[in-house]
């Protein structure tokens, strides 16, 4: 059962119980009889946003353009009814309309119309109906670890765009679009021990609306092998654009490389370290390195991607890593030349490891985003979207140019704390193993404290671990 949100062009005020006016920003809050809370701009007479509270602290906040934020439950259980015709689940439009940063801007009375060009709710609804996906596998158990996943994708009027397969939350395949009205697929999968949850979804041809996910659960009770650890460490000090030069990105990547290579053998059969530094860090070389690693990494293995350099959040709400050969000509150059969320998703989908971690120690250049408050919300939004797109646990430094250039004890602050955590300080239960959650909590506590001591403001790392937690380091 889904709850309905009606989006109409006129947005009339229903009966109300109470109102509140804020003279500082000329916003009128109306508490309606139907439980909705609507906030209006008195100067323009336009609706700013709608807030809907539910039981147990669940909520959704959405703007007239369709941008939304809210709890996971609300996102999965609410649908839009657009102009009385199109019913679309919020979850189907997450990739385009989940924008807590824009909702926050709207809450402050700001105009966000420029961000809605081409991706507003009405534009997305007009792009065509999402296809239907049907997984054909029926067996709930498998005697073999390796299975073939069979499924069909049917065009419902909006065409068939990219197709995504997830295994236990991790994106493992991003396929090309199809011109057939019904497309048949078979894809090999390697299961993990226990129950495996597989989902398949497909976008419409415009890549704006995702289908309802088809879900298949299958159990395999075989024996897993002791994992091997693969680390890809990437760092850029020397950019083609001299204004982007950094001091500690390469030393930081080298420190991570060294730390993981010398750990105890209790956890892994072997440790493999791959590196890309400075001029070697291009979009082409990154993709090539992932392709090479995909031939070696097995399901039971652990994969860690560590990236140090410049990163930014584009106006489309997505994170971009800036490669060494990047030249800043305009904001559009970021989406054209940067390593995008889509690039990262495709690269990470090649990696078979069931346990993985993405660490982005990237600083925001002041040339891209100058408002610190807005930048923090934008970063959180981008990391949420990146982690959902890839299915990989993600931790991001979210530093700025000042801390990146000055450093902390010969390293960037984030990586200094990361290495200190791996040195044993993150091992809260003193069992000799450092888990993903332990390391993340240590970083989350230490980085803000140390940045405040040195620079007078708190650097807040962003993280989205999903439901993953596993030991990544043995002392």
What residue spans do the PLM features occupy?
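Short coil/turn segments that connect the beta-strands within blades of beta-propeller domains
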Residues: 24-26
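Eukaryotic protein-protein interaction scaffolds centered on beta-propeller repeats
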Residues: 1-16, 34-136
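Cysteine endopeptidase catalytic domains of the caspase/legumain-like
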Residues: 78-475
